[in-house]
């Protein structure tokens, strides 16, 4: 059964456009989404409503990987991303839903994340910690203004 829910709120010093791109470009998401100690391989990403994605996180220490994939349900450029995803592992059953809302503010972008349907075998607090780590890495990707 899948009942866990995680909510996060951040303000990043970057435009909504830059953050939106970071969620939908394979090279960018592979850099920031995996929590500390994990690498990411993006196998497929078709970032359009009805499009699908597939990727895996590999624990660098143990070598174990968890593959997952999903479908983009709603994409409002620079404002909202909503997608479903599920793990390949039958021990991690159920479909999760994630909603990312972006809102411009005076110093950058307000970011709200809601992830629902987290499998019961994944402690919600561990999922929350993973998202916190990922969002720190996202900030390091999108906040710097580096000239060419």
Residue ranges with predicted function:
Residues 41-84:
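Glycine-rich portal/gate segments that line the openings of hydrophobic small-molecule binding cavities
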Residues 1-39:
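Hydrophobic ligand-binding cavity/cleft-lining segments
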Residues 19, 29, 53, 72, ...:
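Hydrophobic pocket/interface hotspot
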Residues 82-132:
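Beta-strand/loop substructures that line and gate deep hydrophobic ligand-binding cavities in soluble
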Residues 3-9, 16, 40, 52, ...:
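Intrinsic-disorder/low-complexity, polar/charged segments enriched in Ser/Thr/Lys/Arg/Asp/Glu/Gln
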Residues 42, 141-148:
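Short, highly charged C-terminal tails/helix-capping segments
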Residues 13, 75-77, 105-107:
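Structural motif
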Residues 24, 135-143:
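Short amphipathic alpha-helical signal-transduction/dimerization elements
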């Amino acid at each position: 059964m899948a009942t866990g829910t995680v909510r996060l709120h951040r303000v990043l010093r970057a435009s909504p456009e830059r953050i939106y791109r970071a969620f939908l470009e394979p090279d960018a998401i592979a850099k920031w989404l995996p929590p500390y100690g994990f690498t990411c391989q993006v196998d497929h990403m078709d970032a359009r409503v009805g499009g699908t994605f597939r990727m895996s996180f590999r624990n660098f220490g143990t070598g174990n990987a968890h593959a997952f994939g999903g479908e983009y349900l709603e994409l409002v450029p620079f404002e909202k991303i909503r997608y479903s995803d599920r793990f390949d592992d039958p021990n991690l059953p159920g479909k999760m839903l994630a909603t990312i809302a972006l809102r411009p503010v005076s110093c950058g972008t307000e970011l709200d994340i809601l992830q629902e349907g987290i499998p019961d075998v994944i402690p919600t607090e561990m999922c929350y910690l993973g998202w916190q780590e990922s969002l720190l890495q996202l900030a390091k990707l999108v906040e710097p203004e580096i000239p060419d």
